[in-house]
């Protein structure tokens, strides 16, 4: 009898208001602006970009990671940046092309393979990509550009960020996305062999 009384009072008339669940963020932005092509005209024709040449030499490279957010949404960094077409693909990966620049992406994850010499910057990566980057613009998006290395904000021109081994760079326009847990690089891979 006591158990029934407890159950009845537990189901009583008091209703609890629940706040609505927060909206789920959209992972990737909509449309082609959030999925830019892997190369511009210079790379398509294997021409020099900022004195960076497309060559068949395959030096060992180190890895850096670059993420781009616009209004809180991910911009897909394509496979094939810095690899002149015709691309040889294996699924989403670009395995090879006519020649390679000192900066390249083989997978659509933001993982950038960087030749150790000369010292290369985020501006060099965007130049090879054929996409604009400044303190007021990234790709086709305009507005104040925030750049982070790891979790620390970088003041000044984002093009000047020097790419170093295992550096994690985040570039944002619009709604702020707090830098999250650092990118975990594959263990034992300080450099990438050709």
Where are these regions (language model features)?
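Sec-dependent bacterial lipoprotein signal peptides
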Residues: 1-9
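Ubiquitin-like/PB1-type beta-grasp interaction modules and other compact soluble beta-rich domains
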Residues: 11-194
């Amino acid at each position: 009898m006591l158990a029934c009384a407890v159950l009845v009072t537990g189901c009583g008339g008091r209703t609890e208001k629940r706040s609505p669940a927060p909206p789920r963020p959209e992972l990737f932005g909509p449309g082609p602006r959030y999925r830019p092509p892997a190369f511009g005209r210079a790379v398509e024709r294997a021409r020099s970009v900022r004195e960076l040449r497309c060559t068949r030499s395959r030096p060992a490279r180190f890895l850096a990671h670059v993420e781009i957010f616009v209004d809180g949404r991910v911009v897909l960094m394509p496979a094939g940046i810095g690899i002149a077409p015709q691309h040889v693909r294996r699924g989403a990966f670009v395995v090879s092309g006519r020649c390679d620049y000192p900066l390249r992406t083989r997978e659509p994850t933001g993982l950038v393979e960087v030749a150790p010499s000369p010292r290369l910057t985020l501006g060099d990566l965007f130049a090879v990509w054929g996409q604009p980057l400044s303190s007021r613009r990234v790709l086709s998006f305009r507005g104040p550009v925030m750049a982070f290395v790891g979790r620390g904000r970088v003041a000044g021109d984002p093009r000047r960020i020097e790419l170093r081994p295992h550096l994690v760079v985040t570039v944002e326009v619009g709604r702020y996305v707090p830098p999250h847990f650092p990118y975990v690089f594959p263990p034992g891979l300080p450099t990438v062999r050709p």
